[in-house]
Amino acid sequence: WTSAQKDKVTREIIMGMNWWASLAPDAQNLSFALYSFSDPSVGRTSYEPIKRPQSDEGLWINEIMTNLGYTSGSYFAKVDSLNNWLKSEANADEAFTIFVVNDYNDADNKFADGYFAYAYLGGPFMVMTYDNDGYGIANMDAVFAHETGHIFHAYDEYASSGCECTESYNGCQNQNCENGCVDDVCCI
């Protein structure tokens, strides 16, 4: 990672956070705090994430979490522990972790199985590549915003995802699915 790359990633993530904050109703106080662990020893792993499939994430995420001092449980449990610490530090309601993988020297800017950005519904983390499959670093804010939606239980909206209009979380249906929803809500 160069300093310029790290700075650009930080700026793009902040722009994505600001986009979400700008959508909050006036009565809501939505803000984000960004903590960065950019010490090279923390992010060092014996695996090259970009050369592996997404399904191998546990190998390198586990090492990174151990480097951060989280040594107990699965890699998901370790990330949950970090997120709980982040919530406490920021006095926040929620926290999630972002892993950004440097794909600068990778020809297709994707993991071995074609993934380039993903998050788990409800968290605890998302993974993005630097170039985001041709969206480019200049559009990382949009990719981040999309994946953040998944962290907070938003489903995919594009037709090829297999989304359904009746998918719901907390009783709110996925009306931005491109597969013929009644309300046809806009999506990112």
Please give the residue ranges for each predicted region.
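Short secondary-structure capping micro-motifs at structural edges
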Residues: 82-87, 112-116, 137
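A general structural signal for short secondary-structure junctions and capping/turn motifs
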Residues: 87-90, 117-118, 178-181
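Active-site-proximal beta-strand/loop segments in catalytic clefts of secreted hydrolases
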Residues: 1, 99-105, 130-132, 154
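Catalytic zinc-binding patch centered on the HExxH motif and its immediate surroundings
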Residues: 104-124
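Propeptide-to-catalytic entry region of secreted or membrane-anchored zinc metalloproteases
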Residues: 1-92, 131
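The catalytic-center signature of Zn2+-dependent metalloproteases
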Residues: 121-188
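Extracytoplasmic
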Residues: 91-95, 123
